[in-house]
Amino acid sequence: MKLAIVGTHSTGKTTLISTLAKAFESQGKRVVIVPEMARLCPFPINEGTTAEAQKWILEKQISEENSFDDSEAVVICDRATIDNFAYFFRHCAQFKPEEDLAPWEALAVDHASTYDAIFKTQKLAIAAEADGDRAVGEVFRQEMDDIITRLLEKYSIPHILLPATTDYAAHVAFITEYLHGRDAVNRVSTNFS
């Protein structure tokens, strides 16, 4: 099973993923976490990102995800290709309108179908904390949240909106209940096939 947690930066995705991984591990499941590629990127990110950086992040995300071919593991991705593409889209719209985004957009959208479930965080009215990597400006965070939401809607990418809370235990319960319910539906539909 491959899950992705998406949303604008500084919405608790990484902490949620760590908490979720511990919950799965406590159930005896093997967990693999695909970290956020922007944190590993050798090029500028945030408001000062470049097309080169965003291409690197998108390609690296797909490569890392594809390197885990273990049907027994729960793979949890810190971001998905669609929210990585959102940062690329913003950069090109503002600074490089001549860039041909179509192949990159298609790649991000097509790859979205490889996730068994995508969960989107909500940007709450809580200031972002500086961590040395991500920008903390509210305008930029909101802009990215809006672009991610528009892309998910534009391409009808199935996703589940997480509750508007900073309670990670509530998020884990929500996700596990969703997955349990989905698995039950799949078992029933398989029995009728």
PLM-predicted stretches and their roles:
Residues I5:
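Hydrophobic anchor at the beta1->P-loop junction of P-loop NTPases
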Residues H9:
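The conserved Walker
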Residues K13:
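Conserved lysine of the Walker
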Residues A21-I62:
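Conserved substrate/cofactor phosphate-moiety recognition/catalytic segment
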Residues E36-A38, R79-T81, K120-A125:
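Short loop/turn segments at strand-loop or loop-helix junctions that form parts
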Residues N46-H91, K96:
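Conserved nucleotide-sensing/catalytic segment adjacent to the nucleotide-binding pocket
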Residues C92-A170, D183-S189:
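A glycine- and Lys/Arg-enriched "phosphate-lid" helix/loop adjacent to the NTP-binding pocket
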